[in-house]
Amino acid sequence: TQDASTGQIINRKFINDLPLTSRSVFNLAELSPGVTQAPGGSFGLNAGATNFVSNGGRNSTADIVMDGVSQTNQENNSGITTALYTPPVDAVEEFKVQQNTYSADIGFGGNTVINVVTKSGTNQFHGSAYEFLQNSALNSNNWFNNQNGVKKSPSKQNQFGGTAGGPIRKNKMFFFGDYQGTIARSTGTARAGVPSAAERTGNFGELCGAAGGTFDSTGRCSAAAGQLWDPMTSTYSSSAGGAVRSGYIPYDNLSTYTSPGNPNLAGTPYVLPSGPGNLIDPVALKMMQYFPLPNVAVGTASYNPLNNWIGTNGSRSTDNRFDTKVDYRLSDASQITARFSESRSNSEGVNCFGNIADPCTQGPNNSHSYSASVNYTRVFTPTLVMNITYGYARSYSFTHGVATDFPSFNPVTTLGLPQYILTSGFVATPNITFGNGYQAVSS
């Protein structure tokens, strides 16, 4: 039968012959007119790496169908297309992108629909084996590295697997199976601004020079961006419509400065400790000790306190996935097909700080995906065909956090945080962000 649906079909020959660097069949979608990768999205093996747009449609309304079963997570609240399972390239018989004027059996998605049909066994035994190697010796450097004179980062990826298919009972029952494993290692660099030895004691005088200023005889920086102010000395200004800063900290040195506090606060004013350094929070002081010391241009004229550290980061990941499929011909007019697919992935970034405060990784991540389908087809007449499909797909991912690598860490006894911080169930260092002149700390 024929219908008026439009799109592009990519058969087994093209799937096998076209180069796919990532070995993801969903990269083939970009061969269709009007299909592009969505901003911030990518095509790949992992769930969530199939974010694309087509002919101006919203990427969150696309659908991915495998052997008649939807593989799309519609409830992830992220506004993207998420493939719950991605089959290996060697397991795909046909890949079709449907973009307009859909047939009657398409009604789940509101945009482009990708249809994937997996391979089946035949009366002859067939098999294949492969391995693809990528590493820093064979791969070329990217354009941005070449432009900035940066050498290639060490990397290595091994992707291997095989397929097998044939008859279980000739002319009656057939099987097909495949497996693919991926082991990837990559290394890069991370740059940041970290507290210097002086700043760990409360002396932030480096900030004035970094802002292009100098201190006068009273210790005030000539560059406003390099001057620290005492928040306790803020006063209300009707012309400004709020509090304005009024008391600067001489030489940006908190360790020698004594804040007078603010007696003008309504109610009971917050009482500061007496003596120099009374603005230094003991928890923040302890947290600063978890940062590595500066290692870039230290002691030279080019030293920049806002970009004074470089370290190694990277990632390690493994992925294993397989498909099994059985076709059984009940008669010349009817057939039943069953398929089961599974993938397991593990990844972990390199801890570039070497402790629990590391910003380069969120800790180990484990992902697990299942996909299954049972399909019954009955041909009544050349123009009347019945197809019944039952499917199941599930994917979940869990990030353990950096704290799993440091089981003995206790933020209450180590940093001096309040006891209730342990009741959330996640033990880690607080997250600190800055914006609009205010500081927010959350666990």
Task: State where each predicted segment sits.
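Short acidic-glycine motifs
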Residues: T1-S443
